[in-house]
Amino acid sequence: EDEIATVIKDIDLTGVTLTPADSYAGTFNGNGHSLKNWTSDNTLFTTLAATGTVKDLIIDKSCTLSFPSDKQYFGFVVGNNAGTVSGVENYADVTIPALPTVANYYGTICGNNTATVADCANYGDITYSGSVPTQNACYGGVVGQITGAAAVAKNLFNIGDVTATINGVAAKSVYWNGVLGWLGSNGKLLDSVNQGNVTVTAHGNSQMLTACGLVSYAGGEVSGCYNGGNISYYAESAEGLADGGVQRTGVAGIAAYIGWSGKEVQNNINDGNITFRAGYSSGYAASGSFTKYAVNVAGVFAAVYNCGLNGCKNSGEINFTMTDIDNASSYDYKAVNNPARQSCGGVVASSWGKLTDCENTGDVNIIFTTVKPQEGVALSAWNGKGVGYQFGGISGGDYHSSQDKSPIEGCTNSGDIHIISNATAYNNNAGGI
């Protein structure tokens, strides 16, 4: 742990295969120098111990990087971090040849973090095009996962685009994010920025699927974060068809889910456009904090669970499209005697918690319709299968439909709300706030 290694010049790794350090407890100082011409699907440090530090290292854009498919936690610099990773930057593009064969948490810099990751950045694009996942998969532009009450990620920055094309219906959960894949209970993601576009295309999804600027799932604090990238999920078999079935889906500028239990997150801002396009809702889990509603789309947070928001703002345009809500495979709430709602809002889609001093200035554009029927052919008796909507300028609706749990104070909306819908059979709600 007393070892100090300092890089004194850029390192050309042409034709060199590096062997990862299994466990490192000393200090590795990149000293602002670069690794160049590194071709790798492996890490530098498999595990960084609590006394370990890796800092001030650059992965040059000349490197050729690809994520592996057989590791649970992976980053090109550190796989598992229990120490401190700071000042590390990646400029190389990353390809994903195949989705993982084990449930994974991947980031360009660090895979799993239980301590501190700070002042790190990714400038490279991350790209996947291929078959459906066989295991749950979670990707972050910088870090894969933050877990534990002592875990902190701060001043992280992503400018690279994350682009995923899944050729089929995703039957395993998959999460695509600009900065961080997953934030565990009581961890912290602070003062971090995404400027890259996150674009996901699939034929649909029968398990959780998220596209987010900062993080998919947050069980801890997310404060002072900013998204300027455009975030999109297209559930369709071909461009523009909007024919895919979806369930348990989150699309948002900051996070798909925030559940910092009983506490408040502050000052998160989205300026990117948010786009969701699909055919119909094919179902949802009847219980569970993330899965109450089939679809949640919002500028800042999609679903908020027992957590307050303060000073959160959206200026991006929100576009929510479903054009086949009466599909024969769509969700029928009568079958399980439990309602589902498609939710969309300028700041939050479905909330449980106090909203204070939040602001939306972006337009919210909704298309929620059946396929145009043939002349003389009536729509089904249960138009939309009972799947309704809740759309709003600040919040789509209260997660638990209880105003005393989710008051809204000092919030303003100046964005226009545009709704085109022919859903008739269920309780549909829309409002300026």
What are these regions (language model features)?
Residues 1-433:
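Surface-exposed repetitive/solenoidal architectures
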